């Protein structure tokens, strides 16, 4: 997707809050916006339309 590896890591290495869908750092244990503890890793593959 991205043109070089560093950009891809910067874009995709995130955690997503399951409650408010905020982007968080990959080392986060709770959401920065709402404090929710359940985070999922951002999807690495694009979804089919």
Curated annotation (Swiss-Prot):
Pfam families: Ribosomal_L40e (PF01020). One of its GO terms (biological process) is translation. InterPro entries: Ribosomal_eL40_arc, Ribosomal_eL40_dom, Ribosomal_eL40_sf, Ribosomal_zn-bd. This is Large ribosomal subunit protein eL40. Belongs to the eukaryotic ribosomal protein eL40 family. Keywords: Ribonucleoprotein, Ribosomal protein. GO terms for molecular function: structural constituent of ribosome. PANTHER family: 50S RIBOSOMAL PROTEIN L40E, LARGE RIBOSOMAL SUBUNIT PROTEIN EL40. GO terms for cellular component: ribonucleoprotein complex; ribosome.
């Amino acid at each position: 997707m991205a043109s070089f590896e560093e950009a891809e890591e910067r874009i995709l290495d995130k955690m997503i809050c399951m409650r408010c869908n905020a982007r968080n750092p990959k080392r986060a244990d709770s959401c920065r916006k709402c404090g929710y503890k359940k985070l999922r890793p951002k999807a690495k593959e694009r979804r089919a339309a």
